[in-house]
Amino acid sequence: MLNLLVITLPILAAIGWVTLNIQKPAREQWDRQFGDNKPF
C-alpha cells in the first residue's frame, strides 16, 4: 500500500503541475486575444 502511494503521488503531482502550466499561459493568451469582452 505504501509502495503504491510512493509511486502514485509523484505521478499525480506531475500531472497536476503540467496541467496548471498548460492552462496558465493559455488563459493569459486568451485574455490578450479577447480582453474583457469574453463570450461567456
Curated annotation (Swiss-Prot):
Subcellular location: Cellular thylakoid membrane
Any one of the GO CC terms: photosystem II
InterPro entries with a match to the protein in the record: PSII_PsbY
Membrane topology: Single-pass membrane protein
Source organism, top-level taxon: Bacteria
GO molecular function terms listed in the Swiss-Prot or TrEMBL record: manganese ion binding
Keyword field: Membrane, Photosynthesis, Photosystem II, Thylakoid, Transmembrane, Transmembrane helix
Transmembrane segments: 4-22
GO BP annotations, alphabetical order: photosynthesis
Major localization class: membrane
HAMAP family xrefs: PSII_PsbY
Function summary: Loosely associated component of the core of photosystem II (PSII), it is not always seen in crystals. PSII is a light-driven water plastoquinone oxidoreductase, using light energy to abstract electrons from H(2)O, generating a proton gradient subsequently used for ATP formation.
Membership in a protein family: Belongs to the PsbY family.
Subunit structure: PSII is composed of 1 copy each of membrane proteins PsbA, PsbB, PsbC, PsbD, PsbE, PsbF, PsbH, PsbI, PsbJ, PsbK, PsbL, PsbM, PsbT, PsbX, PsbY, Psb30/Ycf12, peripheral proteins PsbO, CyanoQ (PsbQ), PsbU, PsbV and a large number of cofactors. It forms dimeric complexes.
UniProt protein name: Photosystem II reaction center protein Y
